UniProtKB/Swiss-Prot annotation:
<feature type="active site" description="Proton acceptor">
    <location>
        <position position="156"/>
    </location>
</feature>
<dbReference type="InterPro" id="IPR002347">
    <property type="entry name" value="SDR_fam"/>
</dbReference>
<dbReference type="GO" id="GO:0030497">
    <property type="term" value="P:fatty acid elongation"/>
</dbReference>
<dbReference type="GO" id="GO:0051287">
    <property type="term" value="F:NAD binding"/>
</dbReference>
<protein>
    <recommendedName>
        <fullName>3-oxoacyl-[acyl-carrier-protein] reductase</fullName>
        <ecNumber>1.1.1.100</ecNumber>
    </recommendedName>
</protein>
<dbReference type="InterPro" id="IPR020904">
    <property type="entry name" value="Sc_DH/Rdtase_CS"/>
</dbReference>
<keyword id="KW-0443">Lipid metabolism</keyword>
<dbReference type="Pfam" id="PF00106">
    <property type="entry name" value="adh_short"/>
</dbReference>
<dbReference type="GO" id="GO:0016616">
    <property type="term" value="F:oxidoreductase activity, acting on the CH-OH group of donors, NAD or NADP as acceptor"/>
</dbReference>
<dbReference type="GO" id="GO:0004316">
    <property type="term" value="F:3-oxoacyl-[acyl-carrier-protein] reductase (NADPH) activity"/>
</dbReference>
<dbReference type="InterPro" id="IPR050259">
    <property type="entry name" value="SDR"/>
</dbReference>
<dbReference type="InterPro" id="IPR036291">
    <property type="entry name" value="NAD(P)-bd_dom_sf"/>
</dbReference>
<feature type="binding site">
    <location>
        <begin position="11"/>
        <end position="35"/>
    </location>
    <ligand>
        <name>NADP(+)</name>
    </ligand>
</feature>
<comment type="function">
    <text>Catalyzes the NADPH-dependent reduction of beta-ketoacyl-ACP substrates to beta-hydroxyacyl-ACP products, the first reductive step in the elongation cycle of fatty acid biosynthesis. Is capable of reducing acetoacetyl-CoA, but less well than its paralog PhaB.</text>
</comment>
<keyword id="KW-0275">Fatty acid biosynthesis</keyword>
<keyword id="KW-0560">Oxidoreductase</keyword>
<comment type="similarity">
    <text>Belongs to the short-chain dehydrogenases/reductases (SDR) family.</text>
</comment>
């Protein structure tokens, strides 16, 4: 048994898009994977079935990560099945796009609750386990919108900027116990979140002149989650954006 085949990854929002690609990528390394989903059990079960068909081990667990009680149950179910959590990928997220002056409070709050508070709840719960294990890797999915802003996404941009600050702070708090915390910031990725956008004006701001693929984001996550070379990386944000944001 290799080290990875004994490890367990929890991926939130893993029934589609980047989350699905990440669950499949981590399972391909031999890790056991918990496929979290909020609504579509059919899609989540399909991800689990694909992992099992490829020789891996996975379960699907429903939970709204913005709800503290449901997060607690998600962690309990994971531990009942696999006894440990070595990797947490905080991927679950939503958009409620509209200009600031048209944005309703519920549109603001729904995005903040899931995209930021959900990261807090899952990270806090899993950190307790990782501190006892004296090891663990947490990867938070943020966005280039959290760095550069995006009209019509004040709620989303604020939440994703918050994730970056949260990542840096928690990385400092957990580092002494061997737990790394990093963020991955996708740009425009070919998922259902972008399929209805007019690509032409967007591509003008992407030096590589194309949308990214979920698997390209998942590759960066897989590196941070599993590669020994990532053990000395913490508190960083990795852009996977075709060159949109350069510092």
């Amino acid at each position: 048994m290799t080290a990875l085949t004994a490890q367990v990854a929890l991926v939130t929002g893993a029934s589609r898009g980047i989350g699905k690609a990440t669950a499949l990528a981590l399972a391909a390394t031999g890790m056991k994977v918990v496929v979290n989903y909020a609504q579509s059990s059919t899609a989540a079960d399909a991800v689990v079935a694909e992992i099992i068909a490829n020789g891996g081990e996975a379960i699907a667990v429903q939970a709204n990560v913005a709800n503290a009680d449901e997060v607690d149950q998600l962690i309990k179910t994971t531990l009942d099945k696999f006894s440990r959590i070595d990797v947490l990928v905080n991927n679950a997220g939503i958009t409620r796009d509209t200009l600031l002056l048209r944005m309703k409070l519920e549109d603001w709050q729904a995005v903040i609750d899931l995209n930021l508070t959900g990261v807090f709840l899952c990270t806090k719960a899993v950190s307790k386990l990782m501190l006892k294990q004296k090891s663990g890797r947490i990867i938070n999915i943020t966005s280039v919108a959290g760095m550069m802003g995006n009209p019509g996404q004040a709620n989303y941009s604020a939440a994703k900027a918050g994730v970056i600050g949260f990542t840096k702070t928690v990385a400092k708090e957990l580092a002494s116990r061997g737990v790394t915390v990093n963020a991955v910031a996708p740009g425009f990725i070919a998922t259902d979140m972008t399929e209805n956008l007019n690509a032409e004006p967007i591509l003008q701001f992407i030096p590589l002149a194309r949308y990214g693929q979920p698997e390209e984001v998942a590759g960066t996550i897989r590196f941070l989650a599993t590669d020994p070379a990532a053990a000395y990386i913490t508190g960083q944000t990795f852009n996977v954006d075709g060159g949109m944001v350069m510092f």
